[in-house]
Amino acid sequence: MIIEPVLGGGGCIPATKEYLVGIEEFCRKNNSLFILDEIVTGFRFRYGCIYNKMNLDPDIVTLGKIVGGGFPIGVICGKDEFMKYANTSTLSKSSRAYIGGGTFSANPLTMMAGNTTLSKLKNNGNMFYRKLNNLGTETRKMLDKKFDGRVITTGIGSLFMTHFLKDTIYEIKNATDAAKCNTKKLHDYHFHMIANDGIFFLPGKLGALSSVHTKSDITAMAKSTDGYLTGFKK
């Protein structure tokens, strides 16, 4: 079973620890692999993965994005008992798992960028992540206050997403709830910020803060939101 600890494209919704523990227990009882997709969450909120903090024990973990230092990358980590099937030096081709390879596999530039990024995060982790996560909390509070009950802002740490509510939706607990929200208004809101204030969002998607963002960026987003709300109220 493959699961994201925080839904990315599904609405930026963090799973509860109890839910993830339940999924892991289900996998153990049914002799299934418990696989965590931490491509978005790995090294996003802390130096490491979410599963470490939640005391989960996944069989396989996937990583990407941050561990590549801004360059394309995909990483598969796992327990020896499973990863041994990808070992080309000990198993014959017919006995091992297929691992695709190519010109850009283990690209030296990506490896250097990723290693440099992780080294900097390791050395400055506590201060860096505290600042970044606090900015995310401040952003979510600002958006909820500005829209005054007309949206729910989901997310965790430095990730956030604004959901424009419809009459039948009062909470966002899963991807089904998120899909029932007014995506047109979300697109309109994002296009407003892009066109009028140069604040870029991939329309209809989540927001992700980085180390270069400061409180002034949150202030700019708040000002742009005020401009959007002028027309929104009409």
Predicted regions and their residues:
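Conserved N-terminal phosphate-binding loop of PLP-dependent enzymes in the Aspartate aminotransferase
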Residues: 2-234
